Amino acid sequence: MKKAMAWGCLVPTRRSLIGYEAATRKVLEHLNIETADIPNETCCAPFWMQSLDLTTSLAMAARNLAKAEEMGMDLLTPCSGCFHSYKRVNHVLKTYPDMHEKVDDILKSVGLRYDGTVEARHIVDFLYTDIGAAELQKRSTRDLSSISIGLRYGCHMLKPHELLNIEYSERPTFADELIEQFGVNSVQYPGRHRCCGGLLRGVQDDVADRILHERLVDANEAGVDGIVTVCSLCHLQHDMGQRRKSQCYNRCYR
């Protein structure tokens, strides 16, 4: 089995996310899954860019899919925003032929075409659906039963359900099942499925700060040892925002 990897913009470039790429590569290698990075990968033009120029944003995402199509592989990504973009472009191009034609015209200008044959998968969904929690447990090497975590799915991997075709999006459990196979206690607590406010960062920082404060308080009150994020943007929001929030609210988050 061989997959084309689309890492996105955040994972390879932000210091606090270096572990995402390293861990993903190690896990896939351990599972004997070959990967090949998409050459000269570009930004996937996530959904907020689509409000500025829909056709161009779709063409940007389709470019990476066209590269994967040339490689003859389906695509994996650890980034929820990228996953959302690739699922959306596949849906739009298959549903609206006129939009497919416009996107193809842009791709032709850089010597590419996209026939819509590439399936885009989020790495967590791939591990759960194609590999399976039981198989991962067999390959585990450490006992993590002493750890309690708060799992954050984020918004962009799950919604809208009709487009992304992931488990029922309001109360998902698939990632919980994965980590619980290693003995980890995934604590079910109020607020763990709510937005972290990451998309508001840089636009309305005060609102993003307030929402993050609420999510950190939720996790603190649940008594978890740490937070595990499915979404790289959620990771940045939680990780980089903690020190600032400790100063603003005069509170130490565990």
Predicted regions and their residues:
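Iron-sulfur cluster-binding electron-transfer modules in prokaryotic oxidoreductases
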Residues: M1-R254
